[in-house]
Amino acid sequence: MRFIALLISFFALLKVISAISGVDISSASTIESFTCLKSAGYDFAIIRAYESLGQVDPNGPHSVYNARDAGIEYVDVYMFPCPTCGNGAGQAETMVNYLKGYNANYGMVWLDIEGPQYWMSQSENVAFFESLVAGLKAEGAHIGVYTSASQWEPIMGGYTGGSEFPLWYAHYDGNPSFSDFSPFNGWSTPSVKQYDDTGDSCGLGFDLNWYP
């Protein structure tokens, strides 16, 4: 019995050790900032590459470079689309091609779905989301979705089409675990959690994220 208890404790510890912490940013950065974050134990970064005004983020490619040059192993980007600007596929393709123009080396593209007040009717929102997805798929992007039940449901209603993609969800409880997660709209298990939005060190403001 004692052996079983020790074994359970070992696997629990192994899971904690294998989990990694990361940041997401929406501002300009430097290599020095990411080197500092790397030294502080952050191993992944998610960089804003498209702004909600309907334009690419000019800081995006350079922040991808900076994170890579600082030794951050996992670097993704996120897209904050402009629903009322229309042409989701065009927005997605513009962002991807802008990053390609800089030879920015990143993994996932996370679609940031939040702020119901900035969206349209639920049927229009679903169509716009599917257009974004089509544009990213046409460019060969690996897609994920950043949202939470409180944001997704007012925007998309009962639509479950987003659940074919990994979920990065936000809940600012300061707890780097999925113990708080409740399934919604087809997502039964999340991939990443944004658990704190008050990160401020190494010359950067950032959100804190956790990946098991």
Curated annotation (Swiss-Prot):
Annotated catalysed reactions: Hydrolysis of (1->4)-beta-linkages between N-acetylmuramic acid and N-acetyl-D-glucosamine residues in a peptidoglycan and between N-acetyl-D-glucosamine residues in chitodextrins
Domain Ch-type lysozyme, first and last residues per copy: 20-212
Enzyme Commission (EC) number: 3.2.1.17
Signal sequence segment: 1-19
Entry-linked SUPFAM superfamilies: (Trans)glycosidases
Active-site residues, as the UniProt record annotates them: D24, D112, E114
GO biological process, one term: signal transduction
Primary site of residence: secreted
One GO term describing the cellular component: extracellular region
A GO MF term: lysozyme activity
The UniProt record lists the keyword 4Fe-4S: no
Alphabetical list of PROSITE patterns matching this protein: GLYCOSYL_HYDROL_F25_2 (PS51904)
One Pfam family from the record: Glyco_hydro_25
Keywords attached to this entry: Antimicrobial, Bacteriolytic enzyme, Glycosidase, Hydrolase, Secreted, Signal
PANTHER family: LYSOZYME PROTEIN, LYSOZYME-RELATED
Family stated for the protein in its record: Belongs to the glycosyl hydrolase 25 family.
Protein name: Probable GH family 25 lysozyme 2
